[in-house]
Amino acid sequence: MRYSILKTSLLACTMIATSAAAWAGQAPGAAASADIPISHHDRIYAAEQFSNTVSVTDPVDNKLLGVIRLGDPQPGNFSPLYKGQVLVHGMGFSPDHKTLAVVSIGSNSVSFIDTATNAIKHVTYVGRSPHEAFFTPDGREVWVTVRGENYISVIDSEKFAEKTRIQVPAGPGMQIFSPDGKYGYICSSFNPETVVVSVADHAIVARVKQESPFCPNIAASPDGEQVWFTLKDVGKTQVFNAKPPFNPIKTIETGPITNHVNFARAPKGTFAYVTIGGTNEVKVFRTDDFSLVTTIPVGKLPHGIWPSGDGTRIYVGLENADALAAIDTATNKVVANIPIGQAPQAIAYVPNAAPNPDDRQNLQGLGVAGQVAHLALGPKAEAKSEQPPTSVSLFDQGLIQVLQASVTGLQPKARYVLALADKVDGSGTVQPLAAFMTNPAGSAIVNAVGPIRQIVQNSVGAERRYLVIAPGEPAKFGEAVQVQTP
């Protein structure tokens, strides 16, 4: 009897200790928590925007286990009777690692997924064009940035129902919380202002000026001292004090299409990893003096980024490569590439997500989600520059594709067209596909839909066309400044 009581007490203490340290000593948790070594119980999840899937990867083997299919690709999701999700994009997870919250921008939803079974527990619908979701550190609430409106939808994590709204500047981009759970930090994608909110009463307690209106991502350091957020349009990353008075600390020039930021805590210090979509790199910065440690080539259009539970790995979603890149933080070298679904956006590394590491229920194969073609555009021979080339991915959706171009090397705040030309040099008949305007860094993300792969890869010369970029508008544009490379 005495042995039984002692055993029960030890088990209870172990469970309490495990619960308290659930976040691990890595982001989004507190540095004081214990690290969680990489194991087969861990999972890497990626929200894949054009295949409408969530991929599930084992970090030990760096192997895709399968995908959770939340919706169908085009044109199936065009139907007025379609009930699945569209533009699977944002992602967060609960402190006990048992639930994923996955945001679908096009269907205005948050899908709650059981990490043990990969089953959808509930779908909650919110306002127009939500972007990201994350659980408060106590696990009681899920905050959703409703980017198409001007509020945070606060969802009860047990009832999966909206309990209140927090009004913020229009276009909230992302939210993250201080490791102690006291503050929520919410940047904006439409207004140059980040707000700090008291989690206890949902009141705004501070406002931080953004150097541009377009912040897609924000992260809090595990030591609770700093908040970093990215500015995608101007290619910068800002740092401010995570505690009152929430003063600005540093602005860093990071590069065109600066996407996401996250942290890895190591014996040598805490480092910030920033994905630079326009140059296909991850930049690593110290958090004490903000110096650049190294630049890591990773692949096409790096987007989401997340550390393992022990900080020995950083995983990066490659939006235009349909892959995850694994970085060894000791060497800052890419050690693995894992094929996943189409156009990964947010990713999350969840330690101890799978009680049974061999369970594959509710997972499917990639199917069409694994089919993509890659092209590149560069300056014409007479106008060569040192700017990085434009990467283009054609994501199969059956007989058509979604084209996504990560465009760089153009004039800032200028109008251009992506077009199909008769000749490889951009001459002859030119048919516009998409009009766009570059951001202040001379870059843009451009999309189009159609049977484009069949045209640009056609082996019959008379029927083949070539992708080009020309200045101007569809009704009137100039000579091509970027052309499809061999």
What are these regions (language model features)?
Residues 476-486:
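Short beta-strand elements
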Residues 19-388, 398, 406, 412, ...:
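Predominantly soluble domains enriched in secretory-pathway, periplasmic, or organellar proteins
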Residues 393-397:
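Short, solvent-exposed beta-strand/turn "edge" segments of beta-rich domains on protein surfaces
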Residues 454-464:
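Short glycine/proline/serine/threonine-rich loop/turn segments at secondary-structure transition edges
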Residues 2-23:
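Gram-negative bacterial Sec-dependent N-terminal signal peptides
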Residues 414-420:
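Short beta-strand segments enriched for Tyr within beta-sheet-rich domains
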Residues 466-477:
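Short, exposed beta-strand-loop hairpins at the edges of beta-sheets
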